[in-house]
């Protein structure tokens, strides 16, 4: 039934796949949407979108509210992400150490994994004593060029690879502090290499600073990173120096348990 529903649109399987995943991504980003809203957002006619939605409903990835007639993703999508995360042994290895780091620092700690030109949050520990919560979510991606974790990972790569990732990225001024010139960005990378840690000075989110370090995976390459994030009024330069010792210790603990 699924194949019949989508293949009536086009004989190009790549185009079919793109439309299906664009629909899923659109619903993930916007929440519940009506047929006309989706048609406009995806730039597809309503009959095409309707067939895609029916296919996704048949597979239990999308549900339609009987009262509003709007479409939204089902929890089956969450099940897929949970299955992926459950297969990642780095989460199990790092978890006790990032919990300890969060408890000792009193701040939110993230664990991310390199994902193309982005870093994806694969674990997060929020300190219970602080009421301010970060907008980050496990499963969400963040660009490498404007994040502490991204710079930490990139600093361990050759310059040519960094330039390639930069050119593939959609560089935009997310905040007034976002670095958008490659030469300036490479200066930050050099500073990260010298210090052994990276900073995010409100480059991705106004009012938030973070300190990050890379983590080597089983292949010996820096494909992970951890960070401590907090409102800037709790992240003075003096405190960052104190947090540096904590996060570098955690980096050593995690990597020592991998090899």
Predicted regions and their residues:
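Short, conserved catalytic or interaction motifs in soluble domains
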Residues: 29, 127, 217
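N-terminal helix-turn-helix
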Residues: 1-87, 91-92, 99, 256-257
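Cysteine/selenocysteine-centered motifs that mediate thiol-based redox chemistry or coordinate metal-sulfur cofactors
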Residues: 161-165, 170-172, 251-259
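Amphipathic alpha-helical effector-binding/dimerization core
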Residues: 72-168
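Extended hydrophobic
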Residues: 177-251
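Short, structured helix-loop boundary elements
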Residues: 13-17, 70, 74, 87, ...
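A structural signal for short hydrophobic beta-strand segments in well-ordered beta-sheet cores
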Residues: 62-64, 111-112, 215
């Amino acid at each position: 039934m699924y194949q019949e529903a989508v293949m009536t649109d086009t004989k190009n399987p790549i185009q079919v796949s793109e439309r299906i995943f664009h629909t899923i991504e659109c619903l993930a980003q916007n929440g519940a949407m009506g047929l006309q809203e989706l048609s406009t957002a995806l730039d597809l006619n309503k009959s095409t979108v309707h067939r895609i939605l029916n296919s996704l409903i048949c597979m239990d990835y999308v549900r339609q509210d009987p009262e509003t007639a709007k479409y939204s993703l089902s929890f089956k999508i969450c099940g897929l992400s949970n299955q992926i995360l459950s297969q990642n042994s780095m989460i199990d290895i790092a978890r006790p150490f990032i919990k300890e780091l969060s408890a000792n620092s009193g701040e939110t700690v993230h664990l991310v994994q390199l994902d193309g030109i982005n870093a994806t949050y694969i674990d997060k520990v929020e300190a219970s004593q602080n009421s301010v919560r970060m907008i980050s979510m496990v499963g969400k991606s963040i660009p490498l060029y404007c994040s502490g974790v991204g710079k930490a990972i990139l600093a361990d790569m050759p310059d040519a690879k960094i330039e390639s990732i930069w050119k593939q990225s959609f560089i935009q001024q997310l905040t007034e502090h976002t670095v958008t010139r490659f030469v300036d960005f490479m200066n930050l990378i050099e500073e990260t290499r010298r210090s052994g840690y990276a900073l995010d000075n409100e480059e991705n989110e106004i009012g938030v600073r973070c300190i990050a370090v890379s983590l080597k995976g089983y292949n010996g390459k820096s494909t992970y990173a951890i960070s401590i994030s907090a409102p800037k009024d709790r992240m003075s330069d003096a405190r960052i120096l104190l947090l540096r010792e904590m996060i570098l210790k955690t980096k050593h603990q995690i990597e020592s348990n991998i090899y």
